[in-house]
Amino acid sequence: MHLVVDIGNTDIVCGFYTSEGWQVHLRTPTHQPWTAIRLEHWIQKELTEKGFENIVVESVLISSVVPPVLIQIQKGLTF
């Protein structure tokens, strides 16, 4: 599965993609006190609630217009 992250001024959107298409989308406000651990826990919680557990992420693509948030997101997306 591939993870695509868009860090915008309003929201952070995470999409999980396979050869069969988009599997799940997650959305949260950008301007929160994001830390790497908090991001990791949020993604795990959201995926579990949507029925996606123990997924294997093969690659990550990040797009960002908010550099301070990008640093924490990169730390949190270390697989």
Task: For each feature predicted by the language model, list its residue ranges.
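Short acidic, gly/pro-rich beta-turn/loop elements at beta-sheet edges
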Residues: V24, A36-R38, Q72
